[in-house]
Amino acid sequence: MPKVDVYDIKGKKVSDVELAENIFGIEPNEAIVHSVLVNYLANQRQGTQSTKTRAEVRGGGRKPWRQKGTGRARQGSIRAPQWVKGGIALGPKPRSYKYTVNKKERRLAIKSLLSSKVIEKELTVVDKLELSEIKTKTMVKALADLKVEGKTLIVLADKNENVLMSSRNIEGVKTILLNNINVFDLLKYNNLVLPLETVKKIEEVYA
């Protein structure tokens, strides 16, 4: 069972905590992580691309020249695909790229990445992440005291306006709620900061 140190907001170690083996201590499954990531990115696509067919392009209703006797190839419209400014043959049309993956696969991908953070020593657990006011400077100092540098993802169990607003303008730092956790953010941000209550909630939800 993996064990990690627990720090207060000033970066002082206050205790340690044993993490659930089946969530934070599994062998990361890269294939599942890749599959779920591709699904996540596909679901983010707007799918609004569109081209006009020969029927939709303005003009081209008249036959450009007679069928026979000119020596040229027969043509029916100046908006056929082979013409400049003609319609597009088999071009993209608006469509949805959304598809679903198994709930089990999604959960396994999250657990794989959480375990990866433990293995790579990129997980920081704090006993409480609470600020008395909305102040970016206070949040910057807290992260510095915790020795968290670079891209950082903070996951909260419940909405905390002071933390959300104080971290919003810090470059390379993103704060989300646990119900919005996803593989993309876990891969994009090197460091993961979890308050103790978030750890407990994760162990309840993903048990």
Each model region followed by its residue ranges:
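Extended polybasic, low-complexity segments that bind anionic RNA or targeting/receptor surfaces
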Residues: 1-46, 92-207
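A short, flexible low-complexity segment enriched in Lys/Arg and Gly/Pro that occurs
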Residues: 30-68
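Glycine/serine-rich anion-binding loops at beta->alpha junctions
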Residues: 54-90
